[in-house]
C-alpha cells in the first residue's frame, strides 16, 4: 500500500474512476480533483446520493448503481464511512481503491488488499498525479 509503483500503476491503468462523495460545490476538494481528472482524459462517475449530476454527468447514489466496469474507487468521505465504501468497491469488482488525504481505515485497506485490490490510503490523488503521472497522461 502507498508504494510509488502502486500509485503509478493506478494512475496509468485506472481510466474509469468512481468518485465517492463528489460534490457540485466548486470549493470542495472532491470537485477540484474530479475536474482535473476529467481534463486529463479520465472517465469520472459521480457517486453521491445528494447530487443529481456533477459536471453534466449523472450522479448515482451508490457504487452498486453503476452499470459499467469501474477501475478505481476514489473516496472523499470521512474515515468512519470509508469501510463501507471499500466493501462496496470489493463487491463491484473495482481494481483499486484510493482513500484521499486524511481518510484512514486500516482494517478496510486490509480487506481490500486481501480481496486483490490495489490500495492507496491517506494520499491526495491530484498531488500524486503531479508527482508520478504527469508525464503519462499529459
Where are these regions (language model features)?
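Structural/interface elements that position substrates and couple domains in central-metabolism enzymes
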Residues: 2-70, 74-77, 83-138
Amino acid at each position: 500500500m502507498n508504494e510509488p509503483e502502486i500509485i503509478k500503476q493506478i494512475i496509468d491503468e485506472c481510466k474509469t474512476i468512481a468518485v465517492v462523495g463528489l460534490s457540485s460545490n466548486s470549493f470542495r476538494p472532491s470537485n477540484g480533483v474530479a475536474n482535473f481528472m476529467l481534463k486529463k482524459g479520465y472517465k469520472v462517475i459521480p457517486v453521491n446520493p445528494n447530487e443529481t449530476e456533477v459536471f453534466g454527468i449523472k450522479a448515482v447514489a451508490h457504487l452498486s448503481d453503476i452499470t459499467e466496469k469501474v477501475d478505481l474507487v476514489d473516496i472523499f468521505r470521512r474515515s468512519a464511512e470509508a469501510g463501507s465504501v471499500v466493501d462496496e468497491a470489493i463487491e463491484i469488482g473495482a481494481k483499486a481503491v484510493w482513500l484521499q488525504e486524511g481518510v484512514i481505515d486500516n482494517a478496510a485497506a486490509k480487506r481490500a488488499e486481501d480481496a486483490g485490490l490495489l490500495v492507496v490510503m491517506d494520499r491526495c490523488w491530484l498531488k500524486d498525479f503531479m508527482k508520478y503521472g504527469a508525464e503519462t497522461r499529459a
